[in-house]
Regions:
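Compositionally biased, low-complexity flexible segments
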Residues: 1-25
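Pre-Walker A adenine-sensing motif
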Residues: 26-34
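Catalytic phosphate/metal-binding cores of nucleic-acid and nucleotide-processing enzymes, i.e., regions
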Residues: 36-41, 57-58, 69, 88, ...
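Conserved GTP-binding G-domain of TRAFAC-class P-loop NTPases and closely related GTPase folds
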Residues: 38-41, 129-185
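Glycine-rich phosphate-binding P-loop
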Residues: 43-57
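Conserved substrate/cofactor phosphate-moiety recognition/catalytic segment
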Residues: 53-103
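Conserved beta-strand scaffold positions in the cores of enzyme catalytic domains, especially
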Residues: 64-66, 118-120, 166-169
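Conserved phosphate-donor/acceptor-positioning beta-strand/loop module used by diverse small-molecule
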Residues: 116-130
Length: 185
């Protein structure tokens, strides 16, 4: 039980707060402490070492579930988490390169079918900048230069017609700050 004075597993005051709300119906808009979030799928697009993960942490850490292949280990786990986000109507961000239309379609189709708004952030992907940023990373975070070059060769610029509701262009600076601009075709 510990010295909390409450039941095991509950934080002090939780039972009292729950009892105070007993019998009252809450919605996402009226429940205390709950903020309604739009059903939103965010795709980050760009070379490795272009700033996507840093931007993701700064912009979406508190609001979206992060889908990242290195974090999850396998595409099967990623698909399970994606399906869970869609079923639970939870906003998510795909923190991966997503450089081809086919790679993006894997997320866009299911998200739109589930009623999600799809937003895209394309990171300026200059090969020499990504290689330099990669060299400055901690050894455990570095990607092989060959992998970055191969990704650069596959980039297909995204288009609104792919199913995005919003398109943004992101410039990453050496101090890990970002400038977000409207997309211009």
């Amino acid at each position: 039980m510990g010295g909390s004075g409450g039941r095991a597993g509950l934080t002090p005051g939780f039972a009292e707060d729950a009892a105070a709300g007993a019998g009252r119906a809450f919605t996402a808009r009226t429940a205390p402490g709950i903020v309604a979030r739009p059903m939103e799928a965010v795709l980050l697009i760009g070379l490795q070492a272009s700033g996507k993960s840093t931007f993701c942490r700064e912009q979406f850490f508190d609001t979206h579930v992060r889908l990242h292949p290195r974090l999850l280990g396998t595409r099967e786990r990623e698909r399970l988490l994606l399906d869970a986000c869609l079923a639970a109507r939870v906003p998510f961000v795909v923190d991966d390169t997503n450089v081809t239309r086919l790679e993006r379609a894997y997320y866009i189709g299911p998200a739109r079918s589930a009623g999600f708004r799809v937003v895209r952030y394309f990171f300026r992907s200059r090969l020499h900048e990504a290689l330099e940023h990669n060299r400055r990373r901690r050894a455990s975070e570095r990607v092989s230069e060959d992998e970055i070059r191969a990704t650069s060769a596959r980039i297909e610029l995204p288009k609104l017609s792919e199913g995005f509701e919003e398109l943004h262009f992101v410039v990453s600076h050496h101090d890990d700050s970002f400038r977000v601009e409207p997309w211009r075709d």
